[in-house]
Amino acid sequence: MKITASMVSELRTKTGAGMMDCKKALSEADGNIEEAVDILRKKGLSAAAKKADRAAAEGLVVGLNEGSCGVLVEVNAETDFVAKNANFQEFTNGVAKVVVSSKPADLEALKALPFPGTDRTVAEEQTHQIATIGENINLRRFVCFDVAQGAVAVYIHGVGKIGVLVELETSKGDDERVAALGRNLAMHIAAANPQYLNRDEVSAEVVEKEKEIMRTKALESGKPEKIVEKIIAGQINKYFGEVCLLEQAYVIDPDLTVTKVVENLGKEIGAEVTLSRYVRFQLGEGLEKRSDDFAAEVASMTK
């Protein structure tokens, strides 16, 4: 299969590996992008796991907390200038208020609801803002946590670049210490970017894929085959400690895991506390901009 400039460009964007390494990996994988990513990872040439969520979409992530309810909303636009536009900010915050008050089931339901202070629906207000601001605006996603017993914390990092919701279940949800830990955990999640709540959420397929990468690297580094499995056992636990929130080292006190911090709060307030769920929005994650200039740059490397 012929390896094109756009294929090399896509693989390099996904992995951060060099152009020639990407071209070689694509040749070995017969043009299959995902197989090429694995080839580069096994050779230690890829930062794919950490760069997989790089994105270039602009706009805002906003959050709102009212009582036991918390929401995140992401609205995208064409340029980063829009994030500073008062009309755009008012629209995004208005959408968050609609979500808190009405708790719609999905985007379609949200867009059909009345927009505050107007006689328009959310969808009609979106169209109105497109005409006013002069850029395409996309109401991309939202999430709403509403806990029966406990607290929901909201954290927005930077100018709407990252948003986090954390839900703590406890019979003492009104205790300020619960709210304080929720805010700190939300900041931890913004910084540490866990992929799962706990190891039970990691599929067997993902675990086996990680083990195979570890096995290949260990054997290629000259480690005796008889001790490779022991090495993998240690490395897979380290992997869980990196990607699972409850097993991560707490950023405020790295000597403690997140699980231990939550347990300690329960002892302090005299009631069980459970970190039941979280969500992290990163502005534009999964939305890539085309870069024709970059494709042209690598064209000569693929001839």
From Swiss-Prot:
GO MF annotations, alphabetized: translation elongation factor activity
Region named Involved in Mg(2+) ion dislocation from EF-Tu: 79-82
Compartments it resides in: Cytoplasm
UniProt keyword terms in alphabetical order: Cytoplasm, Elongation factor, Protein biosynthesis
CDD domains per record: UBA_EF-Ts
Cellular component, GO annotation: cytoplasm
Main location: cytoplasm
Family to which the UniProt record says this protein belongs: Belongs to the EF-Ts family.
NCBIfam families xrefs: tsf
Matches recorded under PANTHER family: ELONGATION FACTOR TS, ELONGATION FACTOR TS, MITOCHONDRIAL
Protein name in UniProt: Elongation factor Ts
